[in-house]
């Protein structure tokens, strides 16, 4: 077999660490010609069963025999053989057919009958948690910001708000690109639609706090444009955007963004909740909005885990571990940047442990084994977890307004209707 052919196969498969999609075969400079059915079959097997590639071995040795590769010629002109394209399209359709929630056969325009009860219940829970930015009073926060916080306090809060202000927009970009139009079941469409609306509220809340607290124009603009101006936040945003634009499967993207909302967000939530441990009870508006948003995000991660459980073809544990390791490395860099100084009861070492604890919890919810096996280092977060997972708002003045969402049979007519 010629070295040119080996180079071609390594170019295709050597650049992919875990899975191979047929689109990646199109995105190379070399072209396949005279492709045998056996060759296409081998490609399909590689795609349908994600393979962890040993970088020390030639990819061609792992997947193809020399005899099979000898059936491949390299040409420099378009188009590919239509026969190859047919095999690729047929394979993609076969994968979708194996996932009912992605199949057009599952599409319906009416809400009822409900077929996926857990997804529907999640949607209803999201509705019960509905809140608006106008409910949050920031008057005391402004005084606390100016008079009761240290420079270190303000520094880490600004980092967290800067990340969150951009992150909710990134999450919505993923919902538009990879979720709401890809999943064909009505229950998920409802749940993703409500999530999209609440992510907008989150972004509005964080942006409002930045403009309210930070009066220096240059600093405020830097924070608002953090995905361009702050390296540790840019790295997080780049990782998210990599998955938005990736040609990996729905399962990959579902796992990746469950990590974004379940791991990237958790450390920042914990750092804000730490303020609640302060004796002076500073920044009440920031804290209560953080509670509202943490509740929402808990439901969003729950939705991702429910959707993942509905897939017939889930990722290998080693693949999920690799994705979560990448995310934790990026998150630890953000933590070190946000918390360069040790605060009372809060530092980068403890936060790193907390991130791994949260990652383990997410792995279990996705159906995998724990990887890090560490304890929750923050006692105060155990109490917060109870609040976040509860089905009521203890501090909302209008909590009663959503009390009848579950009571679908209760209909009241006005006397003069």
Swiss-Prot record:
Fe cation 2 binds at residues 199, 261, 297, 300. Binds 2 iron ions per subunit. The gene is RNR2. Fe cation 1 binds at residues 168, 199, 202. The active site is at 206. Pfam families: Ribonuc_red_sm (PF00268). It is an enzyme of class 1 (oxidoreductase). The keyword Metal-binding applies. Keywords: Deoxyribonucleotide synthesis, Iron, Metal-binding, Oxidoreductase. This is Ribonucleoside-diphosphate reductase small chain. PROSITE patterns: RIBORED_SMALL. GO terms for molecular function: metal ion binding; ribonucleoside-diphosphate reductase activity, thioredoxin disulfide as acceptor. Its EC number is 1.17.4.1. The keyword Oxidoreductase applies. Heterotetramer composed of a homodimer of the large subunit (R1) and a homodimer of the small subunit (R2). Larger multisubunit protein complex are also active, composed of (R1)n(R2)n. It comes from the Viruses.
